[in-house]
Amino acid sequence: MVGRRGQDRQIFLDGPYGMMTCVSNVPMNTSERSNGDPRGRPIGVFDSGVGGLTVLHELLVRLPREDFLYLGDTARFPYGERTPEELSRFSAEVTEELAGRGAKLLVVACNSATAAALPALRRRMMETTLGIDVLGVVRPEALRAVAATRSGRIGLLATPTTVASRAYEDAVGAIDPHVTLHAVPCPTLASIIQAGKQFDERAVQTVREVCAPLKRADVDTVILGCTHYPLIQPMLQRMLGPGVTLVSSGAALARQVEHALSTRDLQNPQSGEGEYRFLCTGDTEVFEQAGTRFLQMPLGPVERVELATVEVMA
């Protein structure tokens, strides 16, 4: 099913396992679900592909009464080597779609998009009459990593765009300026993981190569700076060693979302389990096949959407 294409809009930006109910791909009637109460509206979550489902999994476990609407921009996956300008525009288009479908809070479950566009997305959404908060994955991971390190040497595995943004350096430095971050760009790792094929020796060698600089730097904590990476956490742990703490964003971000809902009095008052639904911009069958592996829950039907074009202006 193809979602309705909205009118072109201008957006002004200036910077960088519990079970729930999975419903069909019939568009959620937000006013009917909430009866005018914003607490009954869904939480919007997005990623360039299915990696963000590792974050959604933690949200479903932590917040079982909430409704969720997940959008995977699979037609433009991967985001990891896109320019900051492209990521700002893509993120604006996705958040416009989710906000237009009634999201009460937005979660950027993509490290590259968080690094490039979170401040501007947050500012714009909070300045509109909607007052929608936008949360990302970088700061929760940075906080956990700084708390976990014993030596003050932290590693980062992330896409080239995320590494180049220095978003993690800034976040870690703001928390503890005495901590050193060793960042390693991984240009192909997310695509290898999303493809879902059996890891061959070449793929294993790719993982071994990105781990090598972190072993030489003698880090004791490693941030998994892409939401795809938790799926190969056992392999990463084996190659980095049992003494290295691996930090991913899902659980920490879920706690932050819970806090934001409580602070804004937006917790869903329903007594039963919430609903979760899925949208994607690419092939729905491919999304369903890969998504089940990432979410570790049934997906049900996926709705294909065509995003409205937006103009991102400084």
Predicted regions: what they are:
Residues 12, 22-314:
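Non-catalytic structural scaffold of enzyme domains
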Residues 2-5, 27:
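Short, low-complexity, intrinsically disordered N-terminal modules
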